Amino acid sequence: MDVEFFADLDLDALLASFSSSAAAAGSGVSGLFAPSPPHDAEAGSPESVSSRRPSPSREAALSEIERFLMEEGPAAEEGVGAEDFFDALLVDGGEEEEEEEGKGSEAGGSTDGDSGKENEVATPDAEKEDVEAEVDGDDPMSKKKRRQMRNRDSAMKSRERKKMYVKDLETKSKYLEAECRRLSYALQCCAAENMALRQSLLKDRPVGAATAMQESAVLTETLPLVSLLWLVSIVCLLPVPGLPNRNPVARSSAGRDLATVTGKKTSSEQQLEETLLLHGRRCKGSRARIKLDTGPFRLAAAAC
C-alpha cells in the first residue's frame, strides 16, 4: 500500500504547493498527483528520463517526509491522539464559556441580590406555575391541552366518587340482607313455639270438648290458681265456733225455737252471706260460674 502511494505521488507538485500558496490553492488536491504521460511520448526520450530523476532538494524533502511518516506511529503512541486532542480542545472551550457566564451571573447577582433571594425562597408550586405560564402562554393549543387535563381530572374524580357510592350501597344492602335473614329466623322460631303451645293445649283438652273454642296457655294456667285462692279465702272466712254462754240469764227456749222455726236471719248472718256473695262474684271463671251453696253455712249459724 505504501509503495503504490509513493509511486503515484508527484514530489514536484508537492514541493511547488509548499513554495507557492497561490499555486496550491489553484491546483487543489488534484495537483498532488502526477498526470498520466501522453501516449505519443517516447519512453526513452532524455526529457522524460531527466524529469524522472529527483533533484537533491527533492531527495531531502522525500527523506524528511519518510522520517516523519516513520516517527508518526511511536509519537502517537507516546503522545496524545487526534481524538483526545480535539476532545480536550472542545472541553476547554466549554469551560471557558461557563466561566464567562458565571462571571456575568455574579455581576448581575451583586446588582440584584434581593431578587435572587426571593427566587430561592419561592415555593415549588409557584415555580411550576411560572414555568407553565412561560411555556404555554396564550397559545390555543396550550389552552386546549389544559382544558383536556382539567376534564380528565374531573372525570377521574367523578369515577372515584361513583366507586365510593357504589361501595357504600353494597355495604348497606349486605347489612339489610343479614337483618332480614335474622328477622326471618326469629319469625320461624316464634311460629314453632306457637305451634308447640297449641299442640300442648289440644292434648290437655278433655274428651268431647269443642275444638273450635281455643284457650290461651295463660288462661289455662291461671284458672287453677284462682280456684285455689277462692277455696283458701272461704276457709279463712268460716266463723269460729262460739264459746259457752256464761251469762246467768238463760235464753228463752221459746225465742230460740221461734227464730229457728220462722227462719229469720240475724245481722251477723246477713253480713257473712253478703261478704261471701261479693267474694264469689269476684272469683267467677270465664267458662262457668261458680255457684255458692249457703245452706250449710246457715245451719252452722243457727246451731251457734
Curated annotation (Swiss-Prot):
CDD domains cross-referenced by the UniProt entry: bZIP_HY5-like
PROSITE patterns xrefs: BZIP, BZIP_BASIC
UniProt biased composition (Acidic residues): 127-139
GO cellular component: endoplasmic reticulum membrane; nucleus
InterPro entries: bZIP, bZIP_sf
Domain bZIP: from-to ranges: 141-203
Biased composition (Basic and acidic residues): 150-163
GO annotation, biological process: response to endoplasmic reticulum stress; response to unfolded protein
Region (Disordered): 26-60, 94-163
Membrane-side (Lumenal) residue stretches: 244-304
Residue ranges of the region described as Leucine-zipper: 169-183
UniProt feature, compositional bias: Low complexity: 45-59
Residue stretches spanning the membrane: 223-243
GO molecular function annotations of the record: DNA binding; DNA-binding transcription factor activity
Positions of region (Basic motif): 143-167
Activity regulation remarks: Transcriptionally activated by IRE1 in response to endoplasmic reticulum (ER) stress. IRE1 cleaves a 20-bp fragment causing a frameshift of the mRNA transcript, leading to a nuclear isoform of the BZIP50 activator.
Functional description taken from the UniProt entry: Transcription factor involved in endoplasmic reticulum (ER) stress response. Acts downstream of the ER stress sensors IRE1, BZIP39 and BZIP60 to activate BiP chaperone genes.
Family: Belongs to the bZIP family.
Protein's UniProt name: bZIP transcription factor 50
Gene behind the chain: BZIP50
